[in-house]
Curated annotation (Swiss-Prot):
Keywords: ATP-binding, Ligase, Nucleotide-binding, Protein biosynthesis. One of its GO terms (cellular component) is glutamyl-tRNA(Gln) amidotransferase complex. Belongs to the amidase family. GatA subfamily. Its EC number is 6.3.5.7. It catalyses: L-glutamyl-tRNA(Gln) + L-glutamine + ATP + H2O = L-glutaminyl-tRNA(Gln) + L-glutamate + ADP + phosphate + H(+). The gene is gatA. Allows the formation of correctly charged Gln-tRNA(Gln) through the transamidation of misacylated Glu-tRNA(Gln) in organisms which lack glutaminyl-tRNA synthetase. The reaction takes place in the presence of glutamine and ATP through an activated gamma-phospho-Glu-tRNA(Gln). This is Glutamyl-tRNA(Gln) amidotransferase subunit A. Disulfide bonds: none annotated. The active site is at K74, S149, S173. HAMAP family: GatA (MF_00120).
Amino acid sequence: MPIGAWSDALRNGSATAKEHSEQALERIAATEPELKAFVNVTGDQARAQAEAVDQAIAAKQDPGPLAGVTIGIKDNLCTKGVTTTCSSRMLENFVPPYESTVTERLWKAGAVMVGKTNLDEFAMGSSTETSAFGMTSNPWDPGRVPGGSSGGSAACVAAGQCDVALGSDTGGSIRQPASFCGVVGLKPTYGRVSRWGLVAFASSLDQIGPFSRTVADSAAVLQVIAGHDPRDSTSLDVPVPDYSAALNRPIQGLKIGILQEAFVEGLQPEVEASVRAAAEQLASLGCELVDVSCPRFQAGIATYYVIAPSEASANLARYDGVKYGYRAADAESLSAMTAKSRAEGFGDEVQRRILIGTYALSAGYVDAYYKKAQQVRTLIRQEFDRAFEQVDLLLTPTAPTTAFTPGEHSNDPLAMYLADLLTIPANLAGLPAISVPCGFDGQGLPIGLQLMAPVLQEERLLQVAHHYEQAADVMANRPEAPLVA
């Protein structure tokens, strides 16, 4: 049920938050053995939060804009008193003493947390295969990956285990799993949503955003979590517009740029066909399609895989077995304990990225790799700026392919990294971007359309995505799937 309809039902007495939360927990119990979307199901907290909503309504108090809405929280967001593992052995037993800004705002808005969702370890991956607690399955085909790193959040929404979910996006970790799982995934402008309480991967790239089954629901969640936070020095101190009010504004005359460099060799033919059909759908709604070129777009992935591991190597230096996190036993000295704790606590992919980042930042190579990557990042941002002088939005596929099978890329890191080829540039430039379902391939797997907007233009992004969603009605003729709600 969309958030707007649910809110009406809750307030007119035809439904209760308690009933709604129990339905979500029952759905989780029925599907979780096969789906494995959650690291931790928080049934007691869900019931307590739902009861508080019902009591507020009974007392004629405002329960909040997301009252009773069930939500899954990616397990790299700190939740006070509830384990936050980052799907890593390193933080398997870590219980944060404080609440992240986004979850704090969600609880004040009346949302109900049903659990912490699975992810690639420390958000490093594109499939959830690097999770220390096992891979999440794709609800459309349990024999395929859900994408990553926010695979658990995408899967739980697609499977109807909760209404919405939160993820984090460093190089596509919201949009790519949204594409693979056939849901809406929104990455806001860098700084639009506070990162306070998000376990850091790459601090200049990380951003938090929602998953939902409709664009309107993503707008409703963004409305709550967006806004300045003095605890985050990168948080933007600018007003938050009414995102829901923007959804139905007319889109006639808007210019949509078809980014030529996104339609590359290796793009699955069905993906290209669906995305080009979506562009024509927007043209039929009154948008003007314009071919746009950003020649350095394809340099994004090489740039990212210098900058992100470099920042990760610095951020993950704090896990030394002393202050918190996993501590290895039977070490002969402090230095041996630190080395052993990190070797045993971090998985292979995390260690690989730490090594890459440490190398890129080393004295002999920092100019050749890290500083050069930052220069290319600036050039990519400038190309986007020039593109947005011509058009209002840019359009690409979200991912080059539909969901792949476990193991298909896990032994080939470069092939796995290419899954984020089309999403990474928006992170490098700090742009808002959204993935919306636009079709299915011959195997019944979802395909995602990506739209990108200038900085702080989430209103326009949501507006166009909503009009496309309403006109295309992709899910009306969806194929049957074993775990999809």
